[in-house]
């Protein structure tokens, strides 16, 4: 029988915390405050990110995040439901926020992102509510928008709940 000693870390005592794992099995804990605690399971380092104001979280009602770690580039992609996309550059320790603005060029086609996925070429796929997919090309900073139905429709027909890539490179879109 082995015995492991548990160490209580009060900084991780996150009231009503909801825990998610990223693609590297690191932990992300949110609790309805707009703060997200990132725990690197290998190094045990803890980093706290403010992704939304308290007011915005109250309007949205439920924080939803999807996180992708792009190890070769040192980037962490964080999609939010209600506040667009954040990209954290771990080498520079800088955060960039992408949000949607009417009548402007946007890397994201909605602030209400439902899913994020990285493909084998390094592109980022963002599924959104009502606005289809934003396919972000990391290498040339471009964005392509994909709509299952007419892009002018503002209803559930363009809601993308999940994107999955198969081993052969085909991508499947899950809609409402």
Please identify what each model-predicted range represents.
Residues 1-176:
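Carboxylate-rich, polar loop motifs that coordinate divalent cations or form catalytic acidic clusters
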